[in-house]
């Protein structure tokens, strides 16, 4: 039996740097002493009796964040965080930034409980027992319990009208769906006859699956729990086709289109669409606290301003945001640096979360039998890699700030190996040509392009979305260097 208890850290530092907003770490579950009496933002509501005091809003064992893991100190309450999004649909990024998950990744990419107090996984990896935090509440003060998991499993994803195709695939092992059990009010279990290696990683994903729902709220829109005439009246009032469409519209935990829907996130949406300014306010029942017992997050409000993406660099340079991570790219670096001192902001370079900024994937299942045989020969793929001048790309497109690499796992991963990152990445025209000659592809046409075994010129078509100008520029440079090994790119 493997038991995961909250003991380490989940970080959103790539997104938020030094801003401590209660989403930086997953820690222990013992409430420390020394917390301040109340969050200033809620003092009036508590004084009027419309909101319970802080200690009554927290779970019995909240998630205590270990700031020491990242060298952070206890912060101060107040203020707001302003950023810009290119489209109103991008308010969903609040779920990404908040990173409230049943389990989440720590600094070493290990999974740790967050919303959960503990998690038991058997040695075979096919039985997962989830332990909730007693006293944990939804943002409206209603208890967060096993009923919210049961409702999702029985009344949503296994309801033919709401989910005609059934539960999501990560809740299957092969063709076998999960066996779901409610153990008690604060414990649920998912099991399969075989291991499910995707279950926990899916729960910790950037876009979580939300295998729980606010049952106390959504039942009013479900045919199983609402009088048929009343429910039909609601459907007709909104001009919808069915109760299932109504239920779906009132749910949408990722899209955030319903401001009345209870949440477990650190900030709650308060602005209805359409709008060009979306305001999120702090969740009074959020489950994390700092080392002194102060409820997180520290920041009272999060504001997403919507703007044309082309204007974002100028707005950032004019000091209209507190922090901006989306939409900007390295091509904006020099412009933003010019206004850094005047606008009193810092331009920081962040590591990307992918193994490489861009990657080329030869089609190993190409329908053309001649090309398929060529591409499946590892010597051909190695020659293509050796024919890419990564140093030139770095200098021309990334100001020399990038690192030549293969597309592989990040160095922080326990699966990382230097040879995965460094093999065949040195620009070596001589070695690339030798590999292609060794394959028998030594004949060329009048333009110096190699010929395939059937005599056709070696012309490769690279398909892209065409949405990233940097990718287009990169492909142009690669095309130039591939010409030196007798390969033409379209």
Task: Please report, for each region that a protein language model flagged, where it lies by residue.
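N-terminal secretory signal peptides that target proteins for export/translocation
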Residues: 1-12
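N-terminal lobe/hinge region of extracytoplasmic solute-binding protein
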Residues: 47, 52-123
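Edge beta-strand plus adjacent loop/short-helix module at the start
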Residues: 98, 141, 231-260
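Bacterial N-terminal signal peptides
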Residues: 17-29
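Surface-exposed binding/hinge segments that line
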Residues: 169-246
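Extracytoplasmic/periplasmic ligand-capture domains
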Residues: 15, 36, 40-44, 105-107, ...
């Amino acid at each position: 039996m493997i038991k995961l208890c909250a003991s380490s850290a989940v970080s959103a530092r790539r997104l938020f740097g030094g801003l401590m907003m209660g989403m930086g770490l997953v820690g222990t579950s013992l409430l420390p002493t020394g917390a301040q009496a109340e969050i200033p933002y809620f003092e009036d509501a508590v004084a009027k009796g419309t909101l319970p005091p802080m200690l009554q809003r927290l779970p019995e064992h909240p998630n205590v964040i270990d700031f020491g893991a990242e060298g952070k100190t206890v912060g101060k309450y107040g203020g707001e965080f302003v950023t810009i999004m290119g489209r109103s649909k991008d308010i969903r990024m609040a779920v990404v930034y908040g990173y409230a998950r049943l389990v989440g990744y720590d600094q070493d990419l290990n999974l740790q409980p967050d919303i959960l107090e503990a998690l038991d996984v058997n040695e075979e990896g096919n039985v997962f027992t989830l332990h909730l935090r007693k006293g944990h509440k939804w943002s409206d003060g209603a208890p967060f319990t096993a009923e919210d998991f049961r409702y999702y499993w029985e009344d949503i994803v296994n309801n033919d009208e709401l989910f005609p195709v059934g539960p999501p695939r990560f809740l299957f092992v092969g063709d076998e769906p999960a066996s779901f059990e409610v153990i008690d009010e604060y414990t649920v279990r998912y099991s399969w006859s075989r291991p499910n290696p995707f279950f926990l990683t899916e729960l910790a994903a950037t876009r979580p699956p939300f295998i729980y729902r606010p049952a106390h709220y959504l039942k009013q829109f479900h045919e199983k729990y609402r009088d048929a005439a009343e429910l039909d009246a609601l459907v007709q009032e909104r001009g919808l086709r069915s109760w299932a469409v109504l239920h779906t519209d009132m749910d949408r935990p990722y899209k955030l289109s319903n401001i009345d829907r209870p949440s477990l996130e650190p900030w709650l949406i308060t602005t209805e669409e359409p709008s060009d300014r979306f305001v999120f306010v702090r969740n009074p029942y959020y489950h994390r606290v700092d080392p002194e017992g102060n409820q997180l997050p520290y920041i009272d409000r999060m504001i997403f301003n919507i703007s044309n993406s082309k204007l974002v660099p100028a707005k950032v340079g004019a000091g209209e945001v507190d922090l901006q991570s989306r939409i900007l790219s390295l091509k904006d670096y020099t412009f933003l640096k010019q206004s850094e001192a005047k606008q009193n902001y810092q331009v920081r370079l962040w590591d990307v979360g992918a193994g490489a900024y861009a990657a080329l994937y030869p089609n190993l299942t190409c329908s053309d039998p001649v090309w398929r045989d060529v591409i499946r020969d590892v010597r051909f793929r190695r020659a293509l890699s050796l024919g890419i001048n990564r140093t030139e790309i770095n200098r021309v497109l990334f100001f020399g700030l990038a690192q030549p690499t293969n597309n592989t796992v990040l160095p922080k991963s326990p699966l990382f190996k230097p040879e995965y990152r460094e093999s065949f990445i040195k620009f070596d025209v001589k070695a690339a040509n030798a590999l292609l000659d060794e394959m028998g592809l030594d004949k060329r046409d009048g333009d110096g392009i190699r010929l395939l075994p059937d005599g056709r010129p070696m012309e490769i078509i690279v398909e892209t979305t065409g949405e990233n100008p940097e990718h287009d520029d990169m492909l142009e440079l690669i095309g130039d260097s591939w010409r030196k090994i007798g390969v033409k790119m379209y």
